[in-house]
């Protein structure tokens, strides 16, 4: 009923219901002739991009590989902190910076990590009452700070007092990032010196010094001596081209020299490799000179139970005393005795042949012993077979297209 009353009242208020013509209500606008015209226009084209100073551009296009360094990385963080005092989008900025730190070479810089934590607004995420302390207050910001500490833990970076001061100023003393910081400070000093053979923080850039350090790490005998058989140098040929000669560094101990002197000259020795050795993120390769195990030294293994009830052999050194000096024993391996090791610039037989000729000065028996090279495809030779495999594929595709060409000609 109410809707019906509203309709009746609206009808009485309309100009037609009162007997007033519609043209008079329009006034002078009704005197204009009403015409209908057809207007055609071209459809709008695609939006044109205008290069302005305020346009957004991704950082990967702004910074080239030569410009990706610590100073530019810190400059971006400073520009963001000065632009907005409220630090809107600080979580996204920090997470993006964590992903790009290896590209800028600052993934092991403690100062940069403290700079990332300084991006957080101060004294905003600290809980003010017991209810906020019960729950995870500002969980996204706390998880972001924990990710920063986890990346520091991944690269083995120990936090300092400035890191603790920033976390206290941002999240308070009972937050999850502070607990993560306390766990890191508890375990990091305990595991810092567990490795008896620590790798230096900066590896030597000289390949000869790097090979010398690596061979000393591989060799178990402290009496082993390193010999540089060839230094890297470049030589100009008669035709004007430059020929590069790579380095050869070898190592051999006195016990290995005596083992090689007692080797049968009729039995060949083998040069095998390359074998990888990782020093942090750097991978180097070494080669060994070895022989097959002596079949006369293979002893029959005694069963454990038979040896327990009826001992057939006892390995007891009765002549030893507590005052005897312990010396390094020769390790008997299943593959056979290892006589020497070396590191070379490439796995070429010609280059390794120079190493064998250098060993003949201290091991004259090598001049009478046949040497067999058992070399695998090294890292420098991996790209060559891929190019060779691509050529037969093109030939096969051309052979498959030949019948189609004959059909088209017919």
Curated annotation (Swiss-Prot):
Superkingdom of origin organism: Eukaryota
FT transit peptide: 1-33
InterPro entries per the UniProt record, alphabetical: ECIST_C, ECSIT, ECSIT_N, TPR-like_helical_dom_sf
GO CC term, one of those recorded: mitochondrion
Stretches with biased composition (Basic and acidic residues): 386-395
Keyword Nucleus: yes
Pfam families: ECSIT_C, ECSIT_N
GO biological process: cell surface receptor protein serine/threonine kinase signaling pathway; innate immune response; regulation of oxidoreductase activity; regulation of protein complex stability
UniProt KW keywords: Cytoplasm, Immunity, Innate immunity, Mitochondrion, Nucleus, Transit peptide
Region (Disordered): 35-56, 377-410
Subcellular location(s) of the protein: Cytoplasm; Nucleus; Mitochondrion
Family per record: Belongs to the ECSIT family.
Job of this protein: Adapter protein of the Toll-like and IL-1 receptor signaling pathway that is involved in the activation of NF-kappa-B. Required for efficient assembly of mitochondrial NADH:ubiquinone oxidoreductase.
Name of the protein this chain belongs to: Evolutionarily conserved signaling intermediate in Toll pathway, mitochondrial
Taxonomic classification: Eukaryota, Metazoa, Chordata, Craniata, Vertebrata
């Amino acid at each position: 009923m109410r809707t019906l009353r509203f309709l009746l009242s609206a009808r009485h208020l309309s100009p037609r219901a009162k007997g007033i013509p519609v043209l008079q209500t329009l006034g002078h606008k009704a005197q204009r002739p009403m015409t209908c015209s057809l207007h055609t226009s071209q459809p709008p084209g695609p939006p044109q991009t205008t290069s302005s100073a305020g346009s957004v551009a991704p950082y990967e296009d702004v910074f080239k590989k030569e410009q990706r360094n610590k100073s530019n990385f810190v400059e971006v963080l400073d520009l963001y902190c000065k632009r907005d005092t409220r630090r809107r989008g600080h979580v996204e900025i920090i997470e993006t910076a964590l992903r790009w730190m290896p590209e800028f070479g600052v993934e092991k810089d403690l100062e940069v990590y403290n700079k990332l934590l300084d991006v957080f607004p101060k004294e905003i995420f600290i809980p003010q009452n017991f209810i906020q302390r019960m729950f995870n207050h500002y969980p996204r910001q706390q998880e972001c700070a924990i990710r920063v500490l986890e990346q520091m833990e991944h690269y083995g970076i120990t936090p300092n007092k400035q890191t603790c001061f920033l976390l206290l100023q941002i999240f308070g003393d009972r937050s999850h990032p502070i607990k993560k910081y306390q766990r890191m400070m508890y375990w990091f000093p305990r595991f810092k010196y567990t490795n008896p053979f620590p790798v230096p923080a900066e590896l030597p850039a000289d390949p000869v010094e790097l090979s010398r350090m690596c061979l000393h790490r591989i060799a178990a005998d402290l009496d082993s001596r390193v010999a540089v058989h060839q230094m890297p140098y470049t030589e100009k040929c008669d035709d004007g081209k430059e020929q590069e000669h790579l380095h050869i560094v070898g190592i051999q101990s006195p016990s290995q020299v005596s083992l090689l002197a007692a080797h049968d000259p009729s039995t060949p020795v083998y040069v095998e490799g390359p074998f990888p050795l990782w020093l942090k993120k750097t991978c180097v390769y070494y080669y060994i000179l070895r022989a097959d195990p002596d079949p006369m030294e293979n002893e029959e293994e005694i069963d454990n139970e038979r040896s327990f009830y009826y001992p057939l052999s006892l390995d007891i050194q009765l002549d030893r005393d507590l005052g005897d000096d312990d010396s390094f024993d020769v390790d008997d391996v299943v593959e056979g005795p290892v006589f020497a090791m070396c590191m070379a610039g490439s796995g070429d037989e010609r280059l390794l042949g120079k190493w064998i000729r250098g060993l003949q000065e201290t091991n004259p028996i090598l001049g009478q012993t046949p040497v067999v090279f058992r070399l695998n495809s090294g890292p420098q030779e991996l790209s060559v077979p891929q190019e060779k495999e691509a050529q037969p594929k093109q030939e096969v595709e051309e052979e498959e297209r030949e019948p189609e060409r004959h059909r088209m000609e017919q």
